[in-house]
């Protein structure tokens, strides 16, 4: 919440676009609803699949749980299971003045450098 609150202040009149990569299957299972509630502070949310780190997958646990929680709390969310597709998806959705922020403990921070070249030939 604090990070998105700060992003909101920095964005001014622009939208806050949050890209969230859940970290660990157990945390995603246990805290999906709380993550979803907090992420509604962003104007638009993009959720990727779970960064597993040391954990094995848990049946039925994916980033879709967080995506569904964002929606259930009244937010706007897009589930992008394949993180490699996220820069292209974002390039088609961001607008001039948007602040795009990546959140997560995995490799989600790699998205920014991949997104920038896609935006160079647009107005975003």
For each of these PLM feature ranges, what is it?
Residues 1-124:
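ATP-dependent carboxylate-amine ligase
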